[in-house]
Amino acid sequence: MGLCIAHQLLERQITRSITIIDKEPELGCHSSGRNSGVLHAGLYYKSESLRAQVCVAGAKRLRAWVEERGLPINPCGKVIVPPRGELDSQLELLAERGRANGATVEFWDEQQLHALIPEARTASGRALWSPNTAVVKPLQVVQRLQQELQQQGGVQIITAAAGWQVQPEQCCLNFADGSKLTYGHLYNCAGLQADRVAHLFGVGLNYSLLPFKGLYWQLKSGCLIQPRTNLYPVPDLSVPFLGVHFTPSADATPLVSIGPTATPAWGRENYRGLEAIEPAMAAANLALLARQYLANRGGFRRYVHEQAFLALPPLLLKAAQELIPSLRAEHLELSKKVGIRSQLFNHTSQRLEDDFLCLPGPASTHVLNAISPAFTASFALADLIIDG
């Protein structure tokens, strides 16, 4: 997100001097580089939401940008199926939302579905086809955008692994090595750390990160089941997760990933096992999740029952078999791909935030809930953020 804002600031000649600060020695180590790579078509979002406003236009812009540079892209589309018959009516809702947002969709029968994915199952005999969904390699997108920004001149990238302090009233950052940086305007696009950065400016104090980990499995190369398109279930639209789905990569010989899980992460960078656990945060978020379960706001209890334990292989396999019943455990292997969703919790409303959230601060703008489809819509969202 930060790179796209930098790109648009230069493209629109708003500034000629930009400093990008990252805590890692290489960009894309966290949210952006670990994105699924799916360029979403805009089917899931209410028309009045920011996500709906920018998804379709943003997807077209990013897709064109990728194609112009010859970067890998798999224009494979997406098909959505109801795993249970009573979910068929949700296909109509998704189609309505998609069309309202400018997306192209069409209903398929079982014959059309099986022509593309012979092993797929629809509980109602219908499916929803989205031809404009595509898949890219997100880290390559990040690296190419970084390269082009640096080639333009006027852009420097600073690694601040040891941390920094801010003096908002003086528009000054003080780094651990003793150096300082003054700025005219600061854009906080820190992803998993964005709430912490915002709080240093006195912004968004009623929000905190509630991270959810997305683990993936993948189909073994010798498996005869190899979907050529994205295969998604009809989601529970009351919670911000799309359910376990199949996604072919943008490689020359696509790898098909299955996931992600949507299990609580016990740290902002708790990608594997006990790695980077934050005990205080984990305890606070566990208590928060328990309260959400008891209150059952927005169907949260259903999320817990259906998705919170998908990190357990038998449960993930069961969820995947709702889409492809012939799938077996021996067809799967653990993928190296894992990400953490930068999900915000609103302590005032006691709910998960379900839309982008950009808040102003002193000489600063804070992008606090860059959830999906932020990667898809990144260029269009960058313009929206710049325009305030």
Segments from the language model and where they lie:
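Glycine-rich FAD pyrophosphate-binding loop
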Residues: L10-R34
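Flavin (FAD/FMN) cofactor-binding core of flavoprotein oxidoreductases
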Residues: Q111-H114, V135, S208-G214, Q218, ...
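Short beta-strand to alpha-helix junction loop
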Residues: K46-A57, V81-L91, L128-Q147, H305-L315, ...
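Flavin-dependent oxidoreductases
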Residues: C4, E169-I277
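C-terminal segments that line or cap access tunnels to active or ligand-binding sites in enzymes
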Residues: D251-A329, E333, I371, S378, ...
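Dinucleotide-binding Rossmann-like beta1-alpha1 core, especially the glycine-rich loop
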Residues: G37-Q112, L116, S124-G125, G243-H245, ...
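Helix-loop-beta segment of a Rossmann-like dinucleotide-binding subdomain
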Residues: P72-P82, L94, N101, F107, ...
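Helical element adjacent to the flavin cofactor pocket in flavoenzyme catalytic cores
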Residues: A127-H185, C189-R196, A377-D387
